A protein has these predicted regions:
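Short glycine/serine- and small hydrophobic-enriched flexible loop segments
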Residues: 1-6
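Conserved small-domain helix->loop->beta segment predominantly found in fold-type I
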Residues: 7-55
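Alpha-helical structural elements of signaling/regulatory helical domains
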Residues: 7-10, 58, 94, 111
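Generic beta-strand/beta-sheet core signal
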Residues: 42, 55-57, 76, 84
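Helix N-cap motif at beta-to-alpha junctions
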Residues: 55-60, 89-92
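PLP-dependent enzyme catalytic core of the Aspartate aminotransferase-like
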Residues: 65-123
Length: 123
């Protein structure tokens, strides 16, 4: 007997549910690991999509410190850290790792090193 393929709507709903889980994990982990980050993204998953943004005065340096540790975030002027969550290939464990790395960077103030504050022409 042949199994029927899931509908497009079903697949999209599964992807949305996973994206919500990934962003929820990231937001909740950072609420305790890095409370100095000001969450800009709506807490309601139906209003936030698959990205999470925080405000922090030294956002550029934080993103550079994360890149040095292999975690790619996005910087937006003047002080925004932005992270995208692709549910097709990102795993929950990778989100926990990213939150942990960001938490350690914030707690250790690793971002406050000169090499992370030097602005590149293109980011």
């Amino acid at each position: 007997m042949r199994r029927s393929m899931p509908s497009t709507a079903s697949i999209l709903a599964q992807l949305k549910a996973k994206a919500d889980q990934l962003t929820d994990i990231f937001i909740k982990e950072l609420a305790s690991l890095a409370p100095e980050l000001d969450l800009l993204t709506p807490a309601d998953p139906d209003r936030r999509g698959s990205q999470v943004s925080f405000r922090f005065p030294e956002a550029y340096a934080v993103v550079q410190a994360m890149i040095a540790k292999g975690i790619i975030g996005d910087f937006r002027e003047p002080d925004i850290l932005r992270f995208g969550f692709a549910p097709l290939y990102l795993r929950h464990v990778e989100v926990w790792k990213a939150a942990s790395v960001l938490g350690r960077i914030m707690q250790s103030r690793d971002w406050d090193r000169p090499q992370f504050k030097a602005r590149a022409k293109v980011v």
